[in-house]
Amino acid sequence: MALNYESVDFIKVLGERRSCRFYDPERAVEVEKIQAICQAARNASHMGNANCITVTQVTKQETKDEFTKIVSAFNIPMAKMAPVSLVFALDRDKWYNGLPVGLPILFKQGGVNPSHGWSMDNIENSTLPRLTTFPPEVVSYLLSCETGMAMASAQLMATALGLGSCCYAGQGPKIAEVLGFPDSAQFVWAMAIGYPGESVESMGWRERSPYGDIIFAEKFGTPAIADPAVDQELT
């Protein structure tokens, strides 16, 4: 079935995204919307085109019953209420085995190019030998960052489709066991998805640190200057 949605301004999506913790448990999320959210994650930036991020869809009640026993206690009500949980994981084997495939393809398609110093000789004799000998803990760090980018894309797609979302944690090794992860896969975070049981207004606007406290100009600690009129567009 084709995706049925109304086009939403991207600035509006950024401004209205909230962490939603109350869902309508009686309203199922359409499969095509789940697919669109997962496609947004799939299409996010992937280092070396290695495609190391996985998303496991948890929708069946029996899986949810097992899964919700091993998430953080304060997240259990939300995980039970949400019709869907997407479980994001990184897979180190996909790094070690995927880079030798994905990076040459990226070069041939012009994603990395000679004007920046890339060549097949450089890829095969320098870049790949270096990247594919990174220790697992370094690969996990890099792929955790990559997973975050995929999750951000998924959250924005969910918001654009009129759905709520909220990331939550759990017992990684037990989650891996319940969902059948291979040893190379590592749980990063789960994301509740569903039709909101609360409005954007009731969720409120979360206060953030002042712009200049975390956004710097040229050097760490030198506050960047924000234009209030720009901020107003996002609130």
Task: Show the residue positions of the predicted features.
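Acidic, surface-exposed loops and disordered segments
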Residues: M1-T235
